Design a protein with these regions (language model features):
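C-terminal catalytic "cap/lid" subdomain
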Residues: 32-102, 107-135, 139-408
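Short, Lys/Arg-enriched N-terminal segments with co-localized hydrophobic residues
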Residues: 15-33
Length: 408
């Protein structure tokens, strides 16, 4: 059995947050007339994601002393802000419970350890948070909880209710149900999960703690001249390249998934900070606006929650490939017409969600279709006024209306 030692950490001062939720002056910050403390001074809803590399010892077991410090900092943060905690560590807790020195290779065995460890992990969190006068709630989620619109809205209502009561939701993916070998039902990683949660509750700030200081222009473990990137204002291809190519040590180390999380979060108006979890005090420092980690600056405009769900959570049933003119029109905020569609892939019905791709196969958007796959196959490349002549009827002039399209 794991031993739960209770150590109360003291000496932490309370943080003061401004109450204004969306009062960030992006222009001032970009022009250098505002620092991080001013920019983040109004955050009152924060998601903190902490991965296994921060929670675990070298052998994969949980580092309980580190966890005690993490809980102390999260509790302090919760004095003046709503906090959601996305945690890994269930497998490590299971290893400690079963006294295993090495993680098994079998997917089923790892799922079993996650099932065992989740009980130990949440019990440990409960004891430690109680010591700081905090109540927690557990949510184990799957991809379906996000893709199903009714479950998504219900989950949002539950989280809002918990936060209003100053309860700290502790969230993890339900690994025993959606293990690595089950495709299509797994979110994939807790970086993505934390970004989905941040979008769900419209968080002001997402803090991801990892085992390095933040983003570098190249792998600092390989290149001595690697430069630290303090601020990312525009997440472009140069930033994606800095995260490491797929299959490289740096990329498979997890920075690529954090960049994906940053893309998701910033498009929803949520600032994101990647910081080093070796010092748990960085949780508080990041929220206070101290110069820790890499700050990814949120977009100026928060997209509405329905479009965020459409872009990142809704399951798409098929896809359409569009020409350059249609792609340009989408980026300008216009609907997708049948004349711009070049290829229809998959089988789907009217009202289902599609992926919209350019000629190279790059995903541009997701949207709800006005026509089935069979109908689109007949009217692709046709002008809107020709639809009725081809089908014998016309639902809409647009194949997908801009109100039902979300760029990604």
């Amino acid at each position: 059995m794991m031993k739960f030692k209770l150590i109360l950490l003291r000496g932490y001062k309370n943080i003061k947050f401004k109450i204004s939720r969306f009062g960030y002056n992006f222009q001032k910050f970009r022009s250098g007339k505002m620092d991080r403390k001013e920019l983040l001074g109004g955050v009152k809803r924060i998601v903190v994601k902490i991965g296994t590399s921060t929670l675990a010892n070298a052998d994969g077991s949980l580092n309980e002393d580190k966890i005690k410090q993490i809980v102390a900092n999260l509790s302090e943060l919760n004095e003046n802000a709503e906090v959601v905690f996305v945690t890994s560590g269930a497998v490590g807790a299971g290893m400690g419970q079963m006294k295993l020195a090495h993680k098994p290779k079998s997917i089923v065995e790892k799922q079993a350890l996650a099932a065992i460890g989740q009980v130990s992990l949440i019990h440990l969190y409960q004891i430690l948070f109680w010591a700081h006068g905090k109540t927690i709630a557990q949510l184990l989620l799957t991809k379906d909880d996000f893709s199903d619109r009714r479950r998504y809205l219900n989950m949002r209502s539950v989280l809002r209710s918990l936060l209003a009561k100053k309860i700290i939701p502790v969230i993890n993916e339900n690994d025993p149900v959606v293990g690595e070998g089950i495709k299509g039902v797994k979110v994939g990683d807790n970086d993505t999960l934390s970004a989905l949660v941040a979008g769900l509750i419209e968080a002001d700030l997402l803090v991801i703690l990892t085992d390095i200081d933040g983003l570098y222009d190249k792998n600092p473990s390989v290149f001595a001249d690697a430069k630290f990137i303090n601020l990312v204002e525009n997440l472009d291809d140069s930033i994606r390249a800095a995260a490491g190519a797929e299959g490289s040590k740096f990329g498979t180390g997890g920075m690529r998934t954090k960049i994906t999380a940053a893309e998701m979060a910033t498009k929803n108006g949520t600032h994101l900070i990647i910081a080093n979890g070796a010092d748990p005090r960085n949780i508080v420092r990041a929220a206070q606006g101290c110069e820790v980690g890499t700050l990814f600056l949120a977009g100026k405009n928060r997209i509405n929650s329905r479009k965020y769900w459409l872009a990142y959570s809704a399951e798409h049933k098929g896809s359409v490939a569009i020409d350059a003119g249609a792609a340009k029109a989408l980026k300008e905020g216009k609907s997708l017409l049948a004349v711009g569609i070049r290829e229809v892939v998959g089988e789907f019905e009217r009202g289902e969600t599609l992926a919209i791709k350019d000629a190279s196969g790059r995903a541009l958007a997701r949207g709800i279709t006005n026509y089935s796959s069979a109908e689109l196959a007949l009217i692709k490349g046709r002008k809107s006024e020709e639809i009725e002549a081809v089908l014998g009827y016309r639902y809409e002039d647009e194949a997908l209306h801009i109100d039902n399209i979300a760029l990604i």
